[in-house]
Amino acid sequence: GQQVYNAAGDLIWVGGKQEGQEYGVAYAYRMIDIVRSEADLQNFAWYVDTTPSSGTIYGPGVWATLTADEQAKGQLLQPGDAIFYDVNGDNTIDQYDQVKMGNTVPRWVGGVNLSVDWKGLSLYARFDFATGYVAQNSRKQYYMALSQGTFNTLKESKDTWSEERPNAKYPILMYADTKFRNNYRMSNIFYDDSSYLCAREIALSYSLPERWARVVRMKNLTVSVTGQNLFYWTGSSLYNPEYGVNGNGGYAIPRTVLFGIKATF
């Protein structure tokens, strides 16, 4: 956690680990729907979202009950806005409506090696895996919220809400959240099951028969090719499922191919 001083000048701890909580657990909001049209607004008439920094978002039913001063401090729910899961059913979304996404620490890790030799031909393969964990794709959140300035965005932006795409998967796209709707807050749409199986190393070598080696005046000659970090089987949207908790600051593990010749004279 962090040590901070409250208004009374007392030193307190904020954040950090919670006693009795599972280590590595991740919590976030759960997006359950999108306002598809003006008519659809009535389905969320009593919806209230207190999390946007520019003011609470109100469904049209609640909005109609507010005074002019209260409306000036808030926002009216609009088509394209995300709808988040209300955990306790009080029609108000706040920090207590975050739900468990999973654990960022793999529950199971392991690997397997395979080695086969046949008539001078050798095959070696090494696979490893991690399963039972989730990872936060914070880069996806950053780009989907259009916080990257003039840089390009993701292909998912083609599946964001608009009047022409009312059934899109993602909320309305808005440059740098200029209307402070907070539709792209950290939620389930930015968490993936990052379980993976990796072909960590595959090596193939061939030792020429001695009679062939003698043709080129050698006692033994072995040629080989080795590939490392070749590919992943995974459902993760991260560049690499081994990034860790949120994918920030990570760089993909390089895929390498090595060729070798071993000669004995």
Name every feature range the model reports, one short phrase each.
Residues 48-50, 54-56, 64, 68-70, ...:
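Extracytoplasmic gating/loop element in the C-terminal half of outer-membrane beta-barrel translocons
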Residues 8-41, 160-167, 184, 230-265:
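C-terminal beta-signal and terminal closure region of outer-membrane beta-barrel proteins
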Residues 118-120, 129-133, 201, 208, ...:
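Transmembrane beta-strands of outer-membrane beta-barrel pores
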Residues 125, 223-225, 261:
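Membrane-embedded beta-strand positions of outer-membrane beta-barrel proteins
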Residues 111-113, 201-205, 258-260:
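Membrane-embedded beta-strand positions in outer-membrane beta-barrel channels/transporters
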Residues 108-110, 119-121, 195, 217-221, ...:
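Outer-envelope beta-barrel architecture signal
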Residues 1-102:
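Conserved small-residue
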Residues 120-124, 211-212:
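Repeated loop/turn-to-beta-strand initiation elements of outer-membrane beta-barrel proteins
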